[in-house]
Design a protein with these regions (language model features):
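Non-catalytic signal-transmission and effector/linker regions of two-component phosphorelay proteins
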Residues: 1-29, 44, 135-150
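Charged docking surfaces used in two-component/phosphorelay signaling
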Residues: 41-49
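Short hydrophobic/Thr-rich beta-strand motif most characteristic of the beta2 strand and flanking loop
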Residues: 51-58, 66
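Active-site residues of response regulator receiver
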Residues: 78, 108
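Receiver (REC) domain active-site loop signature in two-component systems and cognate sites
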Residues: 81
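A Lys-centered signature of the CheY-like receiver
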Residues: 130
């Protein structure tokens, strides 16, 4: 087995992605929703290193409250969580006037055809299976944030 050694954040996200937003504009904001503490913390580290303003919530219920309060540019949510799963969160967000226009990206380990179909029906902004390369996710979040801002 060949394991790659990670000695710094540069090894995870790539040195070219470590530069903060150089335009002087307000950083794009992302709300990360995942019930696993380690996943939330790593997501925050990676997104902040790539110039995003990132916050996190441990459940769909907590994320909905935070989304109403913070109005992030994009929400990245896991699917399987206690206290409000990803589908329940998407339903709440899309039916509330304060949050219905926030793009939602699903990032899940549930790599099944039925999940993919339901994601299409839910009209998610994007859908990724875990593991997902940080630079790919960051590029999509930048695109969605810029699209929403225009």
């Amino acid at each position: 087995m060949n394991l790659r050694s990670v000695t710094s954040l540069y090894d995870i996200v790539g040195a070219s992605d470590m530069t903060p937003n150089s335009s002087g504009a307000r950083p794009h904001s992302v709300l990360v929703v995942d019930d696993h503490e380690d996943t939330r913390q790593m997501s925050l580290i990676v997104l902040r290193a790539q110039g995003f303003h990132a916050s996190a919530a441990p459940s769909g219920d907590a994320a909905f409250l935070r989304a109403c309060e913070e109005r992030p540019d994009v929400i990245v949510t896991d699917l399987a969580m206690p206290e409000g799963n990803g589908w329940e969160l998407i339903d709440k967000l899309s039916s509330d006037t304060r949050t219905k226009d926030i793009p939602v990206v699903m990032l899940t380990a549930c790599a099944t055809e039925s999940v993919r179909r339901r994601a299409e029906e839910a009209r998610l902004a994007a859908f990724f299976f875990k593991p997902c390369a940080p630079d790919v996710l960051a590029a999509e979040l930048r695109r969605l944030s810029a699209e929403r801002a225009s």
